[in-house]
Amino acid sequence: PNEGVAMAALLRAALCAAGVALSLYSLHVKHEAERSPSYRAACDLAPSVSCTRVFSSRWGRGLGLVEPVLGKESALNVPNGAFGVIFYLLQGLLGTSGSRVASVTLLGTSVASAVASLWLGAVLLFGLRDLCVLCLSSYGLNLALLGLNVRRWQRHRTDRKPP
């Protein structure tokens, strides 16, 4: 059992490191695209396979939901990559705690990230009609973290001992 927990911890660390890297790169792409309209990122493979186009769209900030509800100047209307950095750091840090509260928080934030991934995936497919390799990669990371967090939560539930 301890071997499985150690392996899950290593996997979590790798997933979170990859997530932070992808999120930081998405912030870089967005910043460069705002500075120079001719900027072309490494993830821009074709006109309909362009992460720059996705990150520069209205859905590239606040999941496309914050601005219509809270306004363009809202403190929550940040690039989606900023949410990603916070999410992956939180997952990595809380993952080092063995507490039940950490397990519940990890699961809750993972479910939220899965819902956000489904929303943004639908926007990609039906709204933008674009393929964003970086986005799809982060959705995969989110799904893997959700799987880890469900298993961890189940382990905490079965380890509970009656008083």
PLM region descriptions:
Residues 2-163:
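Membrane-interfacial helix-loop segments of redox and metal-homeostasis proteins
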